Amino acid sequence: MKKVRITAIRKACYPDLMEKYENPIQHACDVREGQVWIANGWAKPEGFCDSAWDSISAFVMTLAHGGGDFYDGWMKNPRSAMISCNDGFRPVSFYLEALEEDAQ
């Protein structure tokens, strides 16, 4: 099993949708563009958003176990994926890439 690098590539925010549909929340997303985590195999990295992990964990697990080439050639690098979290008000796009380093 391999480690997987998770990089926050882009963070969007839709204040018009938030104003129209969202109840005020105590803790908004604090992910920063360029932020990097290393998943040690299937384990969620410390400090990584639980909701975002729910969105990307299946892809991380597949990459960690040597899989890839999602959706028949979707990514230029077959050992990678671009996956967004499921927050419709402030989605974050994460670039996932399998590393050569073995998970511990």
Model-based region annotation:
Residues 13-17, 46, 102-104:
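Short, surface-exposed beta-strand/loop "edge" segments at domain boundaries and coil↔beta transitions
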Residues 20-44:
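Short, flexible N-terminal segments of the mature chain
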Residues 58-104:
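Short, compact, well-ordered microdomains
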Residues 3, 36-38, 91-93:
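Intrinsic-disorder/low-complexity, polar/charged segments enriched in Ser/Thr/Lys/Arg/Asp/Glu/Gln
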Residues 1-3, 30-33, 101-103:
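A short, structured loop/turn motif at beta-sheet edges
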Residues 2, 8-22:
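Short, structured beta-strand/loop micro-motifs enriched in basic residues and often containing a Trp
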Residues 7-9, 40, 97-99:
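A structural detector for beta-sheet-dominated domains
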